[in-house]
């Protein structure tokens, strides 16, 4: 270890080597030693938690021009390459010698060889930054440690906002996840993200978009999903929110594909997480924590009327990194959907912009990065090391034609399989590809799946069997249309949530349908009046909650066909789907291709 420390001493800032030596973590020192030799930086800067270090990173982000200071105190803006604006599915690989359905794999030795070649000498002439973080609260049974190595001040600045710095927790050879990133060169053809499950290491090069470069975000999710499946807990792409009911607060997790309502749902309750959740079982109860302490959110469409909490965060002094929005000539920002007057000209990720060009002022996947503590609706348990008990789970999709706004599952297995594992959603701008194309995306997590869905779902089902009280599971859809017009307003989600809370509290009844339990009209009418102060007509209800049996049948058959291709799929998955299909067919024989909720209520 001494020789490795002596080598690092030539690169690391004064006194940091002593700190590194004091925590006595030989694998950590060897890891840093190997990465420095691989990437060949001019110097190395460790972030161990001091205010001085955090300020140093902020200054470096500005000096490097990776960020530009804006007129509001604490606000900066970052621009990514015009072709590096979203998660790069086609350039992201799980290193595996076995092909996995729906997972982009590459043989391990081939992938490592390619990546190490790209990283060799990639930091020459630059400074390397090393951050030491905790996923989940410190001193918690949920805690997972992670190290980020990067040559991008913007990336490490983002990590400092989004994650708990936990250098001292790395003592005595504690295990940790490893993330190595180099912004490399602006050559998208050489952009690569490789996830090495065998060594709990993720490599990323020739990219700066945070979804590809900020390791502890969605890159870490691949590693924690694997860890969760091996250990029997859940690592999920879910918000954690507390909703107040007549009997107190109830915590829900909420899973939505990116850009489909997850952040907006988390803003109507007490916020713990807007994106990720670790869920473990303690004494038969499911408890959850947020691995993060910040928000990396989509900004398009955020306006003062619909999103007052986020709007306040983005306009008050405090630490905010905007990315790929428009910077105006006076140092302010503008984004599409803000409902503010569009500026005459400005600067965005493509360079100079003017209104007459007709081009959008900001990218549809433009983002903001802020600390959780900036939000006025932050829950008091946001950093509770013991987590919060989960009473409900929401699986939401962007479906324009079929799914009702809210439905409750009959049971844990019914909800996991026919709602969560059957999710199909219109693709959004958060991933590269054609928008609005309906795609299979179970639990909104397929992009991050490092293993077979069979293993993942088996763990999910087994987790529920260990619970003495499992959360109720709900399917949400905010995007149902009729004649190409949305059937709901943005604020209606507050009513669907309120009904779910009443179901948890057992203060509302429900109508039995072949696809689950739906609300009675009178209950929703009362909730619309109480929650939103507006009337809710029978015609609205009937359009929203008519069960389109034929379309549900087609969907169920599609999902069955998908899962039958998996050799090792749990029999419970196919059986649950086949039972759903039989129920739907029975209802088609009785009612036809669709059935009004009023008719079901009478029957």
From Swiss-Prot:
GO biological process: cellular response to glucose stimulus; gluconeogenesis; glycerol biosynthetic process from pyruvate; oxaloacetate metabolic process; propionate catabolic process; response to lipid; response to starvation
Keywords of this entry: Cytoplasm, Decarboxylase, Gluconeogenesis, GTP-binding, Lyase, Manganese, Metal-binding, Nucleotide-binding
Active-site feature positions: 260
Substrates-to-products reaction catalysed: oxaloacetate + GTP = phosphoenolpyruvate + GDP + CO2
Organismal lineage: Archaea, Thermoproteota, Thermoprotei, Sulfolobales, Sulfolobaceae
Protein residues bound to GTP: 259-264, 367, 398
Native species: Saccharolobus solfataricus (strain ATCC 35092 / DSM 1617 / JCM 11322 / P2) (Sulfolobus solfataricus)
GO MF assignments: GTP binding; manganese ion binding; phosphoenolpyruvate carboxykinase (GTP) activity
Name this polypeptide is given: Phosphoenolpyruvate carboxykinase [GTP]
Keyword presence, Zinc: no
UniProt-annotated location(s): Cytoplasm
Cofactor dependence: Mn(2+)
